[in-house]
Amino acid sequence: MSIKSDRWIRHMAEEHGMIEPFSPRQVRHVEGNSIISYGLSSYGYDIRCAGEFKVFTNVRSVIVDPKNFSEHSFVDFTGDTCIIPPNSFALARTLEYFRIPRNVLTICLGKSTYARCGIIVNVTPFEPEWEGYVTLEFSNTTPLPAKIYANEGVAQVLFLESDEVCEVSYADRGGKYQGQSGVTLPKA
C-alpha cells in the first residue's frame, strides 16, 4: 500500500471525478483575505466544510445512544461560521463530493490549525467505492466557545492505494452511508 502524490490526486479528480469541486493548488487567500488553506497538497487534499451545521445541545435532556440517536440532540444552523459550545461538538459536511476508487482507502485527519485551538476533527476512513459528501465531527475540547469556518480548510484526506483490489467494497456491501448528500446522523 502506498500513499498517493499530488499528480495522482489531480489526475483522478480531473479525469475521473474523484473530488468535486476540485482545487488543483493550495488556496490560502480569497479576495485578499487570509483563510485556512484548502486544496491539493503534496500528498493529500485539504477539504472544506459547507455552511450547514448541526450543533449538539442537551436542552432536551436526551441520552446519547449511537443505536437510537435523537435528532432533537442538535440545533440546525446555516452560516459562514459556526460557534461550538464549550466541551461540545458540531456536525458538518464537506463542500467536496468524493468517489473513492475500488483499490483506494483514504484517511481523513484534522488540520493542525484547528487542533492548536483545541478543536478536533474526527479521524475517519473513506472506504473503497464509497461516494458522497463526508459528514465531519468537530469536537470543542476547550472550556470556551470555539469557531469553525465554512468554505475554508478543515481537514486533510490522504489517499492510500492497495497493491490488490479488495474482494468486497463499501458499495458491494451496501454501506449505510453510501451516497449521503448532507449532514448525516449515526445509523445502526
Swiss-Prot record:
Gene3D superfamilies: 2.70.40.10. Belongs to the dCTP deaminase family. GO terms for biological process: dUMP biosynthetic process; dUTP biosynthetic process; nucleobase-containing small molecule interconversion. It catalyses: dCTP + H2O + H(+) = dUTP + NH4(+). Homotrimer. DCTP binds at K111, S112, T113, Y114, A115, R116, T135, L136, E137, Q156, Y170, Q180. Catalyzes the deamination of dCTP to dUTP. The keyword Iron-sulfur does not apply. It is an enzyme of class 3 (hydrolase). Its EC number is 3.5.4.13. One of its GO terms (molecular function) is dCTP deaminase activity. The gene is dcd. The keyword Hydrolase applies. The active site is at E137. Keywords: Hydrolase, Nucleotide metabolism, Nucleotide-binding. Pathway: Pyrimidine metabolism; dUMP biosynthesis; dUMP from dCTP (dUTP route): step 1/2. InterPro entries: dCTP_deaminase, dUTPase-like_sf, dUTPase_trimeric. This is dCTP deaminase.
